[in-house]
Amino acid sequence: KIDGSFSIDTELDVLQIQAFEYAMKRQMPVLGICKGMQLINVALGGTMVQDIATPQIHRSPNGDQYHNTHITKGSFLYELYGEEAVVNSAHHQCVKHLAKELTPIQWCPEDNILEAFSHERLPICGVQWHPERIKQEFTTTSGDQLLAHFLQRYA
């Protein structure tokens, strides 16, 4: 079950997995954001935690929560942000078992929840956070930097 919010839309989940499989077969670039990251993992055989035990770190009733993350040296996120980045968070689910073809590249040090991965050989990556709405008043991490990198690399 994939559920980026608290509501379930099985028909939408199936459609999104089919769209991902279509893109993957054609080696099209895919950037999964939040539920999109979860969807990629499940579509490739990974599993999810349906309701994480540490919600205070990853969501807030008042909007996005911000927390520190560690980034794997040598990854594209490391090239963009270095070894640490503060990111926004608004999720109650997370990756439990990562699909075999995916490489973990960012995680929350407080609970080891995965925050980003990249595919071993295809132009596919996912982030649990929201680069499109990250606020500079809470972090120096630029979501625009990630989006620009993805577009420049794969457009």
Identify the residue ranges that each predicted region occupies.
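Conserved G/P- and acidic residue-centered "switch" motifs that form tight phosphate/ATP-binding loops
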Residues: C34
